[in-house]
């Protein structure tokens, strides 16, 4: 649409897909598995160099939130279309993200971060933090996503088994067993704000998408404008999302997720440092 010639990379089983039909040039990646194709950083960078491409857009999924890939692209003399490696790292680690947002004045869900790596020390620190935060609460993996490494705890008697289970799942899924605690805000809505930022320090928000209908912490559908929003709340949440993006010098399209409590208060959940598959919902609303 912008008139720039494009190169698409694809695995053999994606040959002929719509995204390849829309590109000017297609490079077939060698390999059969995802690890051998869409996760092969060097092969992707080499495809860009071989075709004379000057920039790489990571799309969504796969390498789109890998800080080391952003660094590798830039080291190869190519332009990385997206946020800096620093922004990806800060927002990708949920405990660091909470601390960064707190410092930026963005409201975060009441809770505590526990940095202990040792299993026994971590569990004891989590127990003490749970007493301060209060029940019901959520245990969440610092590197988590998609509901993995997450446990709701309503009774202190269930805490130890839930914490141990969350840590095991987090290590298996992400190689990182660090867990933090958040107050469980029952009856809350899940609302995300679309932000866009350029390389000159200008950041805007494009309103919200409500994604409260979920199954196993996975979004089922998104709605825009959000049915529970009003203009005052939209602007307040939008400005908080802008502040979140500016706190890490964000560049590109991103999504800041919030919990909207029944009281009307809202709290930062996380930031997705990439374009999302839900982005077209916002495009339909904004044109």
Predicted regions and their residues:
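N-terminal beta-alpha lobe that positions the nucleotide/phosphoryl donor
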Residues: 1-256, 260-285
């Amino acid at each position: 649409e912008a008139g720039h010639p494009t190169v698409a990379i694809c695995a053999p089983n994606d040959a002929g897909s719509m995204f390849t039909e829309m590109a000017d040039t297609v490079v077939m990646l060698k390999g059969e598995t995802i690890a051998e194709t869409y996760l092969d950083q060097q092969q992707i960078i080499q495809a860009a160099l071989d075709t004379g491409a000057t920039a790489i857009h990571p799309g969504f999924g796969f390498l789109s939130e890998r800080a080391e890939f952003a660094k590798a692209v830039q080291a190869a003399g190519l332009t990385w279309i997206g946020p800096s490696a620093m922004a990806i790292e800060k927002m990708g680690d949920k405990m660091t993200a909470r601390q960064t947002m707190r410092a930026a004045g963005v409201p975060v869900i009441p809770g505590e971060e526990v940095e202990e790596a040792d299993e026994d020390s971590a569990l004891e620190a989590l127990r003490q933090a749970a007493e301060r935060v209060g029940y019901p609460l959520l245990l969440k993996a610092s590197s988590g996503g998609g509901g993995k490494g997450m446990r709701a705890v309503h009774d202190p008697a269930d805490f130890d088994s839930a914490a141990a289970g969350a840590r095991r799942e987090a290590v298996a899924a992400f190689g990182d067993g660090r867990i933090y605690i958040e107050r469980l805000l029952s009856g809350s809505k899940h609302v995300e704000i679309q932000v866009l930022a350029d390389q000159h320090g200008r950041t805007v928000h494009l309103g919200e998408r409500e994604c409260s209908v979920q199954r196993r912490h996975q979004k089922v559908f998104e709605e825009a404008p959000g049915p529970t929003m009003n203009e005052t709340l939209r602007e307040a949440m939008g400005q908080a999302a802008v502040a979140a993006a500016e706190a890490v010098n964000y560049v590109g399209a991103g999504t800041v997720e919030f919990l909207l409590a029944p009281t009307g208060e809202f709290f930062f959940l996380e930031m997705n440092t990439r374009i999302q598959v839900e982005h077209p919902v916002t495009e339909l609303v904004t044109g």
